[in-house]
Structures are given as structure tokens and as C-alpha cells.
Amino acid sequence: MEAPYSMTAHYDEFQEVKYESRCGTGGARGTSLPPGFPRSSGRSASGARSGLPRWNRREVCLLSGLVFAAGLCAILAAMLALKYLGPGAAGTGGACPEGCPERKAFARAARFLSANLDASIDPCQDFYSFACGGWLRRHAIPDDKLTYGTIAAIGEQNEERLRRLLARPTGGPGGAAQRKVRAFFRSCLDMREIERLGPRPMLEVIEDCGGWDLGGAADRPGAARWDLNRLLYKAQGVYSAAALFSLTVSLDDRNSSRYVIRIDQDGLTLPERTLYLAQDEGSEKVLAAYKVFMERLLRLLGADAVEQKAQEILQLEQRLANISVSEYDDLRRDVSSVYNKVTLGQLQKITPHLQWKWLLDQIFQEDFSEEEEVVLLATDYMQQVSQLIRSTPRRILHNYLVWRVVVVLSEHLSPPFREALHELAKEMEGNDKPQELARVCLGQANRHFGMALGALFVHEHFSAASKAKVQQLVEDIKYILGQRLEELDWMDAQTKAAARAKLQYMMVMVGYPDFLLKPEAVDKEYEFEVHEKTYLKNILNSIRFSIQLSVKKIRQEVDKSTWLLPPQALNAYYLPNKNQMVFPAGILQPTLYDPDFPQSLNYGGIGTIIGHELTHGYDDWGGQYDRSGNLLHWWTEASYSRFLHKAECIVRLYDNFTVYNQRVNGKHTLGENIADMGGLKLAYYAYQKWVREHGPEHPLHRLKYTHNQLFFIAFAQNWCIKRRSQSIYLQVLTDKHAPEHYRVLGSVSQFEEFGRAFHCPKDSPMNPVHKCSVW
């Protein structure tokens, strides 16, 4: 799944653009008098008089009036032709509809594109700076954000729409889920009540977990009854806090028609294991800030021996980091190499210090047999976790597990807790100002009531007509991939047949799931209590209900049409174990997509993102799954070897890019780079197909660029973005995407059609002689 490409971008007030007639004639030219009226013979004025018939005065006046009326009609006809014919109606086959919205959209598009450009930069030298230079000059990063870009601007508009929807009264028409999400939003905004409660709600949770230090001291009677498995049940099965490992219900990678319990490495608070190892100055700063954060939260919660507790918990997390494997390691990307299906009996032998049957029986409310199969994705890690449990004092294990619950819930507490979180985020990512409360609460509403909020969003901000148009655009791009597969000279016939089958079976979801149109169906997703005065309790109710829904899946039939994200999400994704692409309504907004924009911009905008997700089905990760979403090697050895050889060229290309003295990791970002490059090509060729079928588009007013050039400009302007320097460190370390500058340069420089469109000299930076290409 893609990380969020985190709703219309900051358009100015655009003036209307006046177009000439599509027919290329002036409004008065070719206008003839009505039948029966004689034409002028071209004689001089003096000679004309002698040729007039001798009409009486009344007839002369009548004729003059008719001539005046005819002239007025001609002028009106010219004005109407100027207004309703022209570039704005391109592709409509005639006059555009009343009001001509596409003409205004063309004007907006022209203003947006030209404002973002920096025409002083040679596009053949640095296309990103050419396409985004104007935008980068005009925009600063808001104080409460880590990054800001053209897609983030779309997010701002979507957020404003969602806030207005949530601000409406709780009563009135609509289902129970809609009333609950509004009540939840209000409970989050009620900072007076949250502040009045202070740490008390969290202290109740800690007490439920057994308190700190096994009830206060290691020699108390309660310590003798301490049970690691019971506390793991509380953490994982009640509060959804991953500790020591993660426990989820997922599709079985080798049999995607069934759900399976999946166990994997987890339990670290910081986002990447290398941050715990303090291998460079950046990670040392993060680790020091994390230690301060731990001590601050422990003091707020009234813990004793704060420094000692923090140090012991940190050391335990460092031990977990040392036995973990980075998510970007080759081992983790090869799913077949980590997939290990075992019975509960076998799992018990791998990790003898955990009581797996008891733990799973409690969480799932089942009576599992020893033969129940689970998927273990980190066998070596779990063996070492068992040894870590054996060698770690119970008090430290207990405090670590309680800490993991505290970390998960602390963002929902009173201002002192939120300030501590902000100070850590500031050191890690550089955001100077905490998010305003309304944005925080909107984020929580999205997280806990995503589909309920989505039902409100699509009802008012995404039409069925837009859904149909985007679906057609997706089909056009899929068609091009089918053609490209036939043309590949490095893939043999057997592998091509399997690749075509995968394309044919691929599911495409656009806009929103249909069940959102039925309030009673949405209500079933949120059958838990919500009260406006109990924010943290609302969170806990949501967590417990989500766990209930998840554990029920283990015996349910798989429905591959379900969505991972709600429709207002500013994201798009491909799921290999479903062979499913999803394009939510939240990302199908201007400037990425506008039904009235020139198609060059739609294909360069949302089209390249569609192509990106489509290509994920055939990259180094998605290519491990077959047409049904099963982990199955469908390549011949010869074709796969040639694929890896071509992929290595891309690895070397991105390894040569640096940002803030950090080298981009070409292997780490390989899948996304393949998808960027492939998506650009697929969308471009799909646009050429559209032009062949509908005819060329009229130029954008006052822009000297061809529509082929505008396609590439639109692609680049998807990724106009500014980042804080601290966040760049984490991006290069943890993000599977290359920095945006190089997402653009790496893609266009390897595509021969870009060099042709901009007439770039051979071996110029954007048109190297030797290019990397997979799809």
C-alpha cells in the first residue's frame, strides 16, 4: 500500500479567457443577409445613389430598420460564437454547454500552470526546477506542517469540506453513524473537559494493566501472580498496542481466499530500528529526544524512579531493534523468504516462553486446536524474543508493556501530554508549531469513523459522473499496459501470458464503495457508544469494536471488494494480495483531476498516479503475487533474471542522487521508482490514444507549450513540495519513495518521449544517451 501522497490547489481568482471561434472565422465574417435582400454591388457611395429604386419615404425607413436589425443580429451571433465555440469545447463535438464551465476550467488550468513554472530554467537541464520553480518561490511551509506541496493543498480543501460537514448539528436526517461521528468530533474539541480530567483516564488504563513496577514494588504479593501472557492480552487484545510483536488478521498470502492470523516483528516506538542504534548524529539527536519524552510522560503519570524506568524501557527497545530486520532490507522485500506457516504447536516450540493457545483463545474468544495454522513472518526474531523474555527481569518487561499502551493513547490526553509529543516530533521532524485542535480532531474522526465521514463526503463532493469518467481513464491506461506487455522484448511468451492474466483479473475501485450509499450498512461499522463528554472512552470503545470486527474475520469468507481506506483519503494504493487498485474520491480532485480540464493535464496528473499504481502489480514487490493475489512465482527464470537486470539499472540511477548530503537508497526505493517510471509511460501513451480518438486539443490560452509538453509539466507539478530539513533525514531513512525532486528527474530523464517533446539535445541531463527502462 502507498503512503499517503500526504482538497482544489491554491488557484487564484482566474479571469475568463476569450477564445476565437473553433471554425477560425471572425464573428461577422461569412454573415449573409436574409434571402430576398439584394447585395451591394461594390459601387462608390455616390454611384450607389443613382442605382437605388425610387421608393417612398416609408419604404426607405422600413428598409433602414431591417438592415439595422440584421446587423445587430450579426453582431450578437459573433459574440455568441466567440463565447461558446473555441478551445474550451475541445472534444465536445460542438458548442460547449451553457455557462461553458470547461472554458473557465481551461483558464484556471493555464493560470495554475504558468504560476508554478520558472521559465528562466532550461527544462532540459532541470525539469523539476523548471516545472515547480514558481511554486517553490511563492510558498512557505506552514508552521504546523512538516511539508507542503500541491497535493497538500488539495488536502486543505478536502479538510475544509469535512470540517463543514462535521460542524452541522448532530440531529436531523442521516444514520446513527453520521450522528456518532459528529458527537465524536465534538468530544475531541472539548479541550476544557479533557484538561479537567488530566491524567486520570490514562491512570485508570495503567491500573487495568497492573500499574507500574508490578503494582509498585517487585516484592509485593501481586508480583508473584504476574503473568506476561495476561498483560500481552491487555496490550494487544484490549488496547491494540503492539508489544514485542504484532498480531493481526490478514489475507493468507499463499491462499488469498482465506484469512489467517499473522505474527510479525513489532514493538518499537520510533519509526525505524536504526534510530535506536545511534549510528549517526541525526539518530543520536532523535534518541536523546525520545528519552526526554519518556521521562516527561512518566512524570506526568506519577511514576517513581522516572530516569531508571525510562532507561530500562529504552534499553529493552534497543535490544528489540538489534534483533529486528529493517523493513527495507532485501530479506523483508522477498515475501516468500519470510513467509512461514506453522501450527500453534510448532509456534509454541519456537517461542516456549509465551502461551500462544491461551493468548489467542482470549483475544479471539475461540478454542483453537494445536493444529490451527498461523503465518509467522519473523521466525528468527520470535526465537530471539523468547530468549529476551527469559533473560529480562519481569518488572522491566511489565513496565515496557505498560509503556507501549501509554504511548498508543497519550496523544488523546490533556495538553501537557500533547506538548511532550510535540517536542519529540519537533526534534525528529522540525515542525515548529503543533497542529491546531480542529485538524487533530478531524484526523481522529478520519481514523475512527472513516467510512461514516466518507459517506458524508461523497454525498456532496463526488458525483457518479466523475466516477464513470475516471473508470474510463483507468481502462485506457490498462489497455496501454496490455499493449506494452506485447511489445516487451525481454519477457518471454509464457510470462507475458501470466502478466496479461493478472491485468485482466485486476480489480479497480474508484471513488467510494457502494455500501456507503446505504446508511444502515454504514451504521453496522460503528456499533459502539459515543458521548460528547468522554473523548478517551470514545477512543477506547472504537479500538475494542475494531478488534472485535477484526477477530471475527478469521472464520469469515473473504470479500476482496472491501476498501482499506475511506473515500476521503488523499491517497491511492495497490494491494498485491487482492490484485486490487483503489482510487478514493479524496484524490480525484482538482488539480490532480478535473473533468473540465484539458485531457493532457488529467492524464499527466491523476493519470500518472493511476499508471503508478498499476505498475506496482509488476514491480519487485507486487510482481511476487499472481492474478488471484496469491504469493506465487509466475515468471520464468529467464524473464525474471532479465527483469532483475533492468531493475539494477534503476537502482544505480537513484543511488547517484543526493539530498542534504544524504544519498538516496536506490534499492530501498526501487519499487516506487519502477512504478513512477512505468506510470509516466503508461499515462503518456494513453493520452496519445485519446488524441488519436478525439483529435488534438486546442492550446491553453497564453501558454506557448504543446499539450505533450503540458502532460509532462502536469506530472512534475504533482510533486511540487517543500520539506523541513529534519523531515528530509527521516524521509530518506524510512520512506519507500525517493525525494520528490528525483521522482520527477529520474522518471522524465529515462523516457525518450520527454526528450522529444522538449527538443532536449542528446546527452543533456534530461536526455541521457543510456536510459533505464523496465515497462
UniProtKB/Swiss-Prot annotation:
Membrane-related topology note: Single-pass type II membrane protein
Compositionally biased tracts (Low complexity): 32-51
Cited PROSITE patterns: NEPRILYSIN, ZINC_PROTEASE
Chain residue ranges for the region called Disordered: 23-51
Localisation: Membrane
SUPFAM superfamilies, alphabetized: Metalloproteases ('zincins'), catalytic domain
SS bond partners: C124-C760, C132-C720, C188-C441, C649-C772
Induction: By mechanical damage to nerve cells.
Catalytic activity, EC: 3.4.24.-
Bound cofactor: record note: Binds 1 zinc ion.
Glycosylation sites recorded in the entry for this protein: N255, N322, N656
Superkingdom classification of source: Eukaryota
Cofactor: Zn(2+)
Keyword RNA-binding appears in the UniProt entry: no
Active site: E613, D676 (proton donor)
Reported tissue expression: Highly expressed in the CNS, in particular in neurons of the caudate putamen, diagonal band, the paraventricular nucleus of the thalamus, part of the hypothalamus, in cranial motor nuclei, inferior olive, and substantia gelatinosa of the spinal tract trigeminal nucleus. Not detected in cerebral cortex, hippocampus and cerebellum.
InterPro entries referenced in this protein's UniProt entry, alphabetically: MetalloPept_cat_dom_sf (IPR024079), Peptidase_M13 (IPR000718), Peptidase_M13_C (IPR018497), Peptidase_M13_dom_2 (IPR042089), Peptidase_M13_N (IPR008753)
Function per UniProt: May contribute to the degradation of peptide hormones and be involved in the inactivation of neuronal peptides. Cleaves the synthetic substrate Z-Gly-Gly-Leu-pNA and releases pNA. May protect against C2-ceramide-induced apoptosis.
PANTHER family (UniProt xref): ENDOTHELIN-CONVERTING ENZYME-LIKE 1, ZINC METALLOPROTEASE FAMILY M13 NEPRILYSIN-RELATED
Protein name per UniProt: Endothelin-converting enzyme-like 1
Organism of provenance: Rattus norvegicus
